[in-house]
Design a protein with these regions (language model features):
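Catalytic Walker B motif of ABC-type/P-loop ATPase nucleotide-binding domains
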Residues: 147-151
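Conserved structural motif at the start of ABC-family nucleotide-binding domains
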Residues: 2-4, 17
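ABC transporter nucleotide-binding domain
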Residues: 165-252
């Protein structure tokens, strides 16, 4: 189990994580959503022990994570950027094998062949999507007990996305893998996660289970220009403004959302994935 209690972090004088609480159950998949600047990446860097909190506690298997080598060896972390790109996938694998006693060479070979990656080529010549696949091959070959992913399918084509999700779901079912996924795409998470947490201004504001997400949680973009509008009849989980356009995640039925917004004659109104 991953448990975060009262996590607090200040960076450059700004409160990034504000007494945050969350829990990820063993063998479950938890989706973490929130606007840019909400603190998703900072939270993840605490969960994997890269950053030390100013206050609060982070436990995995009831043990603190920071400077805990044994716990870190059980964590697989795939970030938005890959490191050590000046060497080949094969050379990276040798490093991972030395670092992780649970390294599975047979699985590594299966994965890079499945994703059709050349293990002898330098990773720096790979496209962004290929680098993501390379990271996935390496991390999944460590046979992690906890998998933490920051925008894991960004830049992947549809076939690669399906393969990534297949391996993750299979490991959850077969090995009781525990997964936390940070994503901006609500629809992408819909058929994958057991729960979703909405991170906003450094706090988990709302949590939902999968069935509830499918029927009551909707992401929209809307613009009314300079017109004053009233959205008090909608339960807005969070909102993000991009000029005159608002990005909203709303906890409500789609029919009520269409009625409340449609009655106010929006210039733009789209249901987003």
């Amino acid at each position: 189990m991953i448990k975060v209690k009262d996590l607090y972090k200040v960076i450059d004088g700004e409160v990034v994580l504000d007494h945050l609480n969350m829990q990820v159950e063993e063998g479950s998949i938890y989706g973490l959503m929130g606007p840019n600047g909400a603190g998703k990446t900072t939270l993840i860097r605490h969960l994997v022990g890269v950053l030390k909190q100013d206050a609060g506690k982070i436990f995995i298997e009831s043990q603190p994570v920071y400077e805990n080598i044994e716990i870190k060896r059980k964590i697989g972390y795939i970030s938005d950027e890959m490191y050590f790109i000046e060497t080949s996938l094969e050379r990276n694998a040798k490093v991972y094998k030395d670092l992780y006693p649970s390294w599975n060479q047979e699985r590594f070979e299966e994965l890079y062949k499945t994703f059709k990656l050349n293990p002898t080529k330098k990773i720096q010549i790979f496209s962004k999507g290929m680098r993501k696949q390379a990271s996935f091959c390496l991390i999944m070959s460590t046979m992690p007990k906890y998998l933490i992913l920051d925008e894991p399918i960004d830049g992947l084509d549809p076939i690669a996305r399906k393969l990534v999700w297949k391996y993750i779901i299979d490991d959850v079912a077969q090995r009781d893998l525990t997964v936390l996924i940070s994503s901006h795409n609500l629809k992408e998470l819909e058929g994958i996660v057991d729960h979703v947490g909405i991170l906003y201004k450094g706090k988990i504001m709302k949590e939902f289970d999968l069935e509830y997400i499918q029927t009551h949680i909707h992401k929209i973009q809307v613009s009314f220009g300079d017109k004053e509008v009233h959205l008090d009849d909608l339960n807005i989980a969070y909102q993000e403004e991009r000029g005159s356009v608002k990005i909203l995640i709303i906890e409500d039925s789609l029919s009520n959302i269409r009625k409340v917004i449609g009655d106010q004659s929006p210039l733009i109104f789209d249901i987003l994935p």
